[in-house]
Amino acid sequence: MSKPRLIASLAATVGEKYVLTEERRTAYYRSGFRSGSGGAAAVVFPATLLEQWKVIQTCVEANCAIIMQATKTGLTEGSCPSGFDYDREVVIVNITRIRKIILLDGGKQVLALPGATLHELEQLLKPLGRAPHSVIGSTTIGATIVGGIANNAGGALCKRGSSYTELALFGQVDAEGHLNLVNHLGIRNLGETPEEIFANLEKGEIPDEDLEGMDKLASDRGYGDRIRNLDAKVPNRYNADPERLYEVSGSAGKVAAFAVRVDTYPIPKRKKVFMLGSNRAKDFVALRDHILSNFKELPEMCEYMNRGIFDTAERYGKDVFLSIKYLGTEKLPKAYAIKSSAEYFLNKIPFLPKFLPDLFLYYLSRLFPQHLPKRLLKYRDRFEYYLILSMSDEGIDEARCYLEKEWSRLEGVDFFECNEQEQEAALLHRFAAAGAAIRYQNLHQTTTEEVLALDIALLGNDKEWVEELPDEITEHLELALYYGHFMCHVFHQDYIFKKGTDIEAMKKKMLRYLDAKGAKYPAEHNVGHMYDADSTLKNFYESLDPTNTFNW
């Protein structure tokens, strides 16, 4: 099928308005959230499940490479094309217009269509006293429920593990190149044909008596037990864990998801955030061991930051912090799209500095007063390592008692209970940390190389959780920034190297060090185009997509 005929066929399905082909208009969708970009013949926006099905049918018939895309919040370039040297036309299928969420069993589960976001689910569930899998970070920037499932998204919450379900509806291209619809939703009376199934789902009415599949998992229900195993010789969670790879779950877009069925969670009646500081890594090891061994209630979350990322996020993540606090989360995805389009246009003007919007936002944020509360800043000055420990209900008293009577007796440690302002600021600051390294590098392009970001899962029994890099690496480093999900032993490590450093050589050395520790990577960001998939993932991807049609 010729390119003009392909574009015409796609437009006939979704309307010309929803088929983008101009470079300027597709720039945002062809680029990654942090990095990465490539070429595409078209970006298509179906509005219904049937339109999505027909678009994919057209692409399969035309022998296109299909990239399934949602809100493009992935951090490893997996939601955009990689380069401009594909051997066939690339079509990006963006499913953000298909956003229905259906409550099941009084809200204990939901059925989500592919474009439905975690933020929308959070708002829908709040009156019912329930919450989605993730409630910070991914919800803030508009990530979809399906995207989380497809990438084993971990999130910050200690009780929930990776996003996971065994109940899904998806399109799959078999070894003969035929597109098939696989219905494993566990719901009766949806119909037999794609048209019938899609129509019944989009009506949004599913009686409880039609629900089956109760023997299948709609979340990682065993995670609370796994995280407590302090002798574990495997990480608690990581992207290539064979126990968490199942059809759409962990598929990374190698099938086309049309709907997933997932569990929801009760909202705690009370929450309290504690800020902890120490200059010795072993003090936090003692805390982790005690909490996971003795507490009846697991923490809601326990987020780690080192001083380097605290300082960098304070300065270079300030605009993100202020945007979320004062503009809210709903406008952020659109704001990112506008920023990306502006960058694409401005970067084509030779005499202008690259990433001009980043420069503007950085200097604009500097006009605002200090955004972090005084007690957080005092801890930054006193300590090298920080934990943001969030407890709920009975766990609040457990934590308070342990911190006051035992942990605080350790030499050189301290903690305080956050008030509401401090709690909000601490969590927003931790979220703003995720983009701080990129912003720093964008503003220091003449003296630094691109950011090397590693997403790491340490073994459950690893006590040496603070990295000690050899001189052959540190002599080339400008900044080493560490943050992550401490109880889960999942860490995000952003390295900014001096100009002229061989980044690939540095990455190989670091990965060899991690391999020697038995660590797994990536932990929760998926391989995208930035990591090599191990044999477990490769075999899984090949079983899902033997013709390599999806998400190159």
Question: What do these predicted regions represent?
Answer:
Residues 18-23, 45-46, 66-70, 77, ...:
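General beta-strand structural signal in soluble alpha/beta enzymes
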Residues 60, 126, 515:
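Anion (oxyanion) recognition and catalysis
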Residues 114, 119, 126-285:
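FAD-binding subdomain of flavoenzyme oxidoreductases
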Residues 1-60, 74-110, 262, 309-317, ...:
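N-terminal flexible segment immediately upstream of the FAD-binding catalytic core
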Residues 33-35, 41, 71, 76-88, ...:
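Conserved glycine-rich FAD pyrophosphate-binding loop
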Residues 246, 256, 261, 272-283, ...:
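C-terminal cap/substrate-recognition region of VAO/PCMH-type FAD-linked oxidoreductases
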Residues 48, 73, 108-109, 116-121, ...:
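Short, structural beta-strand-to-alpha-helix junction motif
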